[in-house]
Regions:
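Short loop/edge segments at beta-strand edges and connector loops
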Residues: 24, 41-43, 112-114, 120, ...
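Short glycine-rich, flexible loops that bind phosphorylated cofactors or substrates
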Residues: 29-30, 64, 148-150
């Protein structure tokens, strides 16, 4: 089997292998609302040159919860906004309730059961929520999900089955419908955590 690889300067190279592993990950996906491009993603949050005085994080999954804890731990005024009633939707309800309670106890401001209507940029970012609340912060981070990074791979063209969310469909052995091609991590519909792909 051959793979055609292009480097940053568009130089092409063919690589041959018996089996091919796809582990290209995913990228942040933001909801569509006015000012959504004012948000930074988790990668950009790690590249900040200095800590903001305040941040709003939009989302309730493990990335949002992790970054809320990190920023709060560094003394940043942290606001966590999400649609569900508690953080970590899909996890055990007792864990979700206790974790949300502990986040509040540590000083994280929680705004459950709301969505962002718009983000305006002035001296600070002004985030308007669906319940008419306005939150003023130095940064706004989106952590509402990730989409597989497959658009440049050409996997559809060779017949690899793709799911509704744009993910590569794999079996319990991470094998695609093409027996010599495997996929792991955010590019699949399985558990999407960095350590799975490593």
């Amino acid at each position: 089997h051959e793979v055609l690889v292009k480097n940053k300067s568009s130089k092409e190279r063919k690589i041959s292998a018996k089996k091919i592993m796809i582990a290209v990950g995913g990228k942040s996906s933001f909801p569509d609302f006015d000012g959504n491009l004012n948000m930074i993603n988790s990668d950009e949050a790690l590249d900040l040159n200095e800590l903001p005085n305040s941040i709003l994080i939009y989302g309730s999954g493990y990335i949002a919860v992790e970054f809320a804890g990190i920023f709060n731990g560094f003394g940043v005024e942290t606001n966590l906004v999400f649609r569900s009633d508690y953080v970590l939707k899909g996890f055990d309800i007792d864990i979700r309730k206790k974790l949300t309670e502990q986040m509040v106890n540590r000083g994280i401001k929680i705004f459950p059961e709301v969505t962002i209507e718009k983000i305006e940029s002035n001296d600070q970012f002004i985030t308007s929520l669906s319940d008419s609340t306005k939150i003023f912060t130095d940064k706004v981070m989106g952590a509402t999900g990730r989409v597989p990074n497959i658009e440049l791979l050409g996997v559809k063209e060779i017949g690899v089955k793709i799911g509704k969310q744009g993910n590569i469909i794999v079996n319990e052995f991470n094998q695609t419908n093409i027996k010599s091609i495997y996929a792991i991590g955010d590019v699949t519909d399985r558990i999407n955590l960095t350590p799975v792909a490593i």
